[in-house]
């Protein structure tokens, strides 16, 4: 009984309970205010109906993805009172504008440190004009150049990435930068944490940035202060506050580790035990990552520093040159192919992550193989995949057989029949696949953090590694074909037809509001 009451007390007085109660209090206050004015209900209803209609017209004319427009317009016309209030609260842009302005200024001030080597671009122009145009676009509008002299090691599962990361962290001499969406205490984080503390004692500069929502209920209260006391410089990106606001949508979904400026890790693997199968949640957890060494690491170094200084808020720029690699023995003198690490921000007008994916799809000639944990594509992605399949390209896509979110799976299933009818082959992995991979035509591949859903494509800070004619491209392909043969089941039109009417109705409703989920 003592254990029960202790557990109950922990739940009642937990940070999560406090946040839920504060959010609930705000909702109840709005409802109370509305019902207090019930004697004027007719006037209020007609006023909000007019406001809802005006907002619907305003949204219709915004330069925004049509799916977002539809997700707001339907409730504004159907339930104008609550939808109008929700719209004004959830799209309040003051906080977003402040962060956006800081982000724009920081990217502009760091641009001189991310200059494209024109010789590399000239060589690429001769070799492949399509990739050349993509590199020019990402450099000009994303702010990240493409590199040669960069090696890539591909990891098929989180366990491989973890082992390599531990090995490289132990070799750190100057600095370690970590930026992750999720950190959870357990075997994985405990081992990394121990290394970081030891390195900080040795004089290595250690910085950690983690998302305030992704790790909200996984770490103790004020955990960043504990790490600071251990010599680890730490910031929490956009700490979750119990306020109804649009800024809570913009999360730092990146996974970056940079060591001494010569080595970087990127991919889908967070710092939690399920990512290395030390804890089972949804069957076998399949994830992927890459380790890059060489010139291309600089993009990840600057990506981290940009975000760090925005969150730090002191407005002081680093002496960025101090983070250039000093140990040239770790730098490859030459390496085949081209590597482009890039980031994507929800606070600008460029959907870099989606456009890189669309470029791969539109330029594919033989095949496109994709893995994604969340399949909620917008019309542009669906149209591009359909056109590729109809034109004879082998388009295959793997999603989880065991989902981590039931409603996401329900929405994903609503796309199955449509995509299969277009010629896309869809498979489900017999576990949970968290890898975000694209590979095409034995030439190009992307491994990173960008899912095929609205949150990744439009709302989150993301990053990925684009590879062209790098040996690791063939490893990404081989991994896809291996799990396709051994661990996947193909979804057929018959499977889609067997879904119950209720299941299809739920999917249809959820799909309308999927941009807001």
Language-model features: locations:
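N-terminal localization/anchoring segments of enzymes in phospholipid and broader phosphate metabolism
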Residues: 1-355, 359, 363, 387, ...
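A short, conserved beta-strand element enriched in hydrophobic/aromatic residues
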Residues: 287, 371-372
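Glycine- and other small-residue-rich loops at beta-strand/loop junctions that grip anionic moieties
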Residues: 181, 373-374, 408
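Helical hairpin unit composed of two closely spaced alpha helices linked by a short loop
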Residues: 374-395, 400
């Amino acid at each position: 009984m003592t254990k029960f009451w202790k557990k109950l007390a922990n739940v009642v007085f937990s940070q999560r309970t406090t946040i839920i109660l504060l959010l609930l209090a705000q909702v109840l206050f709005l409802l109370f205010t509305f019902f207090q004015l019930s004697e004027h209900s007719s006037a209020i209803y007609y006023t909000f109906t007019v406001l809802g209609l005006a907002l619907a017209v305003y949204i219709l004319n915004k330069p925004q993805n049509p799916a977002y427009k539809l997700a707001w317009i339907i409730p504004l016309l159907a339930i104008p009172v609550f939808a109008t209030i929700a719209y004004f609260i959830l799209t309040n842009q003051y906080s977003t504008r402040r962060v956006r302005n800081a982000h724009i200024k920081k990217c502009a001030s760091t641009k001189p440190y991310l200059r494209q080597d024109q010789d590399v671009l000239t060589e690429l122009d001769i070799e492949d004009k399509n990739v050349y145009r993509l590199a020019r676009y990402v450099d000009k509008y994303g702010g990240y150049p493409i590199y040669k002299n960069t090696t890539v090691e591909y990891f098929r599962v989180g366990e491989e990435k973890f082992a390599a990361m531990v090995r490289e962290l132990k070799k750190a001499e100057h600095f370690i930068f970590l930026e992750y969406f999720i950190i959870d205490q357990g075997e994985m984080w405990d081992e990394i944490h121990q290394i970081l503390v030891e390195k900080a004692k040795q004089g290595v500069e250690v910085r950690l940035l983690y998302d305030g929502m992704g790790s909200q209920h996984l770490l103790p209260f004020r955990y960043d202060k504990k790490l600071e006391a251990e010599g680890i410089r730490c910031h929490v990106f956009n700490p979750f506050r119990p306020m109804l606001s649009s800024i809570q949508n913009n999360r730092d979904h990146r996974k970056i580790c940079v060591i001494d400026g010569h080595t970087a890790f990127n991919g889908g693997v967070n710092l939690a035990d399920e990512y290395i199968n030390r804890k089972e949640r949804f069957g076998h957890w399949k994830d992927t990552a890459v380790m890059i060494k060489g010139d291309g690491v600089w993009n990840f170094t600057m990506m981290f520093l940009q975000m760090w200084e925005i969150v730090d808020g002191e407005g002081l720029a680093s002496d960025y040159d101090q983070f250039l690699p000093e140990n040239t023995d770790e730098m490859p003198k030459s390496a085949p192919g081209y590597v482009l690490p890039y980031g994507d921000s929800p606070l600008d007008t460029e959907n870099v992550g989606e456009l890189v994916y669309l470029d791969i799809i539109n330029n594919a000639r033989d095949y496109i193989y994709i893995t994604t944990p969340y399949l909620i594509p917008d019309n542009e992605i669906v149209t591009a995949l359909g056109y590729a399949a109809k034109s004879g390209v082998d388009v295959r896509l793997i999603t989880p057989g065991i989902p981590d979110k039931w409603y996401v799976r329900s929405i994903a299933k609503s796309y199955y029949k449509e995509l299969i009818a277009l010629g896309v082959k869809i498979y489900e992995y017999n576990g949970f696949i968290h890898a975000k991979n694209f590979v095409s035509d034995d030439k190009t591949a992307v491994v990173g953090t960008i899912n095929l859903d609205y949150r990744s494509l439009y709302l989150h800070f993301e990053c990925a590694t684009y590879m062209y004619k790098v040996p690791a491209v063939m490893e990404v392909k081989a991994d896809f074909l291996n799990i396709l043969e051994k661990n996947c089941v193909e979804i057929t039109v018959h499977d889609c037809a067997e879904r119950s009417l209720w299941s299809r109705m739920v999917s249809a409703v959820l799909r309308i509001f999927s941009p807001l989920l």
